[in-house]
Amino acid sequence: NNLFAINSDIKREDVDFVLFCTQSPDYFLPTSACLIQEQLGLRTNIGAIDYSLGCSGYVYGLAIAKGLIIGRIAKNVLLLTAETYSKFLHPRDKGNRTIFGDAASASIISTEGFAEIGEFALGTDGKGANNLIVRTGASREKKTKNDLSFDENGNPVSSDYLYMNGAEIFTFTQKNVPVVVKDTLLKNNLEQPEINLFVLHQANKYMLNFLRKKMKIEEEKFYYFLSEVGNTVSSSIPLALCEAKRENRLNGNVLLAGFGVGYSWAGVVLKA
């Protein structure tokens, strides 16, 4: 609703597809995108789907939306992200509760806008699935196990709450993010100095600083938006883009890269 309120050139009746990225839907069924269509008062002759991805979700959403537009299935795609990881965190999980924040975003992807969507570099490695997981609640292990215990540091361990192997996630990140950035540059026929701004998934400040130094990116070209919201999963990149746009920093080539749970990663260049 805020998107339509602040953008007079975007009308509800122009939306012909809804993409909704979330890993914390209200229901197993129906599809949340169908509920959103009704709640927003959108037309009924439109497409609407959910997809479940975490920190790479926004960039994947851009890829899906671009495909829908190029394939002439849609002209104006409403791309939504919404994540409430707080539902998955035990109240005494001090480590993860200080990292994650709940947030949502709304973007219109169309043939007109402030930036052209370039080529994508995508990646998947399911071997890392167990390193960031909520085991119960879905069809494989539907019932809660109530197997709560505490490790030597007093952190809760339970199949019913989010588990993150921080060391393995860091290893995955420092190995794969430079690769996806390099692949994204290659796909778009660009060199690193030609990128005006790098907007990566806002995992945490330490990890982002490590990656920036590893990839030898100047600090003034590397965007941070964490202090007020934390790691907002699929919403972190669009929130950062929104803030960067307010600061008039979305000029020239802007490289986006999302990475995390799955493992899943994705990169693209926006040409503003």
Please name every model-derived segment.
Residues 1-16, 142-196, 207-215, 240, ...:
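Conserved active-site "lid/cap" helical segment
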Residues 3, 15-18, 36, 61, ...:
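Buried hydrophobic positions in well-ordered alpha/beta secondary-structure cores of metabolic enzymes
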Residues 72-104:
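Flexible, glycine-rich active-site loops centered on histidine and acidic residues
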Residues 21, 52, 77-83, 109, ...:
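Short beta-strand segments
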Residues 29-31, 89-93, 265-269:
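Short acidic, glycine/serine/threonine-rich loops at helix termini
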Residues 24-25, 38, 43-45, 51-73, ...:
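Claisen-condensing/thiolase-fold acyl-transfer catalytic domains that form or cleave C-C bonds
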Residues 93-171, 175, 179, 259, ...:
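Condensing-enzyme catalytic core mediating Claisen C-C bond formation in acyl metabolism
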Residues 27-42, 79-85, 148-154, 207-219:
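Acidic-glycine-rich active-site phosphate/pyrophosphate-binding loop
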